[in-house]
Amino acid sequence: MLIKNKKSRKGSHMNEKVLTVVVPSYNVEAYLADTLKSFIHPDIMGDVEVLIVNDESTDSTEEIGRSFEVRYPQTFRVITKKNGGHGSTINRGIQEAAGRYFKVVDGDDWVDTENFRKLVKMLKRLDVDVVGNNYTWVDHETKLPTKRQERPFEGFEYGRIYRLEDVA
């Protein structure tokens, strides 16, 4: 799911990022490079901000994030903070988010790059408050899907655009 960023600058969409992805990260060196690679598509690099929020990892999580920050400075940024748990990393990312929308993707998860590209292109055209999406659980060792979750929000008609006041 992604949500509209209410602190985003209204009316100044020229240089604004469309989407901020907050990547909470704590000791995810085994997965982080795959996570970050999944956001890379030349059609959308200027539209996406990826904030890797390092929760004081003790492995090479920060170094992996910094390597993406150096290679793609217009898209990736590492924020290192005192260890405070998963929720505190999300909160810090939201505080720093510059995109019109934000989404959380944990440091041991990834997105389908082509579907992500389509999502970002769609967000450039629409003005919505919340977007829900399907997801699949994948076994990290075998890389095989274990469960696909379609229509994760019960009670909503899919294929419609809802305003935030309709769902909250």
Place the predicted regions along the sequence by residue.
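Nucleotide-sugar donor-binding/catalytic module of glycosyltransferases
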Residues: 4-168
